[in-house]
């Protein structure tokens, strides 16, 4: 039995293409892998606090007493990291906003990236500590950006996930959604076909 963690990060709730596609993934995965356990975390509905000068102090090893706000941030960071490490498959629904990931997803990464916990520095360079996982990124875009200079989502997510130790990453693209109903329907259809292929593998 595998454990699957689905991270939603769209601000558009049910209208979101990435949310709809991640829901489709959950339906298909549940049908094909009925014994697996699926956890869904909606980072827009339940937002992660923005990392600031006070909160960053909670995430660095120190003997200094923590403020109540820092204690909350550290506890949340511990919870998010434990959840991430406890799952085998990580599904990230990542809409493109202004060429990059959403603020909601970035805030999550900022609390998950902790030296000595999810990565460490060695004499050979950084080493990821969140290993043995597979990641599936479902990314929706209004325009066409794949493989072009305006796609900052794909390289950023590949780099971040690899940095913490997740190197088996597959991407599902839904592009051209803003180009009209026909293109949006084709984008959904193509993305669902890609999801079907991943689920069946």
Swiss-Prot record:
It catalyses: 2 a quinone + NADH + H(+) = 2 a 1,4-benzosemiquinone + NAD(+); N,N-dimethyl-1,4-phenylenediamine + anthranilate + 2 NAD(+) = 2-(4-dimethylaminophenyl)diazenylbenzoate + 2 NADH + 2 H(+). Its cofactor is FMN. Signal peptide: none annotated. The keyword Flavoprotein applies. FMN binds at residues 10, 16-18, 96-99, 140-143. Keywords: Flavoprotein, FMN, NAD, Oxidoreductase. It comes from the Bacteria. The keyword Flavoprotein applies. InterPro entries: Flavodoxin_fold, Flavoprotein-like_sf, FMN-dep_NADH:Q_OxRdtase_AzoR1, NADH:quinone_OxRdtase_FMN_depd. Pfam families: Flavodoxin_2. GO terms for molecular function: electron transfer activity; FMN binding; oxidoreductase activity, acting on NAD(P)H as acceptor; oxidoreductase activity, acting on NAD(P)H, quinone or similar compound as acceptor. Its EC number is 1.6.5.-, 1.7.1.17. Binds 1 FMN per subunit. Homodimer. Quinone reductase that provides resistance to thiol-specific stress caused by electrophilic quinones. Also exhibits azoreductase activity. Catalyzes the reductive cleavage of the azo bond in aromatic azo compounds to the corresponding amines. This is FMN-dependent NADH:quinone oxidoreductase. It comes from Shigella flexneri. The gene is azoR.
């Amino acid at each position: 039995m595998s454990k699957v963690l689905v991270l939603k990060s769209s601000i558009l709730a049910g209208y979101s293409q990435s949310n709809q596609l991640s829901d489709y993934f959950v339906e298909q995965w549940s049908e094909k892998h009925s014994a697996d356990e699926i956890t869904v975390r909606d980072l827009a509905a339940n937002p992660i606090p923005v990392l600031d000068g006070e909160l960053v102090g909670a995430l660095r090893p120190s003997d200094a007493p923590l403020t109540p706000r820092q204690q909350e941030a550290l506890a949340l960071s511990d919870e998010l990291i434990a959840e991430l490490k406890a799952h085998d498959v990580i599904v990230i629904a990542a809409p493109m906003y202004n060429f990059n990931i959403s603020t909601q997803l970035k805030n999550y990464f900022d609390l998950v990236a902790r030296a000595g916990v999810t990565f460490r520095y060695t004499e050979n360079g950084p080493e990821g500590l969140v290993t043995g996982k597979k990641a599936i990124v479902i990314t929706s875009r209004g325009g066409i950006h794949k493989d072009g200079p305006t796609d900052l989502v794909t390289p950023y997510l590949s780099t971040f996930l690899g940095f913490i130790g997740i190197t088996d990453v597959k991407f599902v693209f839904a592009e051209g959604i803003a180009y009209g109903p026909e293109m949006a329907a084709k984008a959904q259809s193509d993305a669902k076909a890609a999801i079907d292929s991943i689920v069946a593998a």
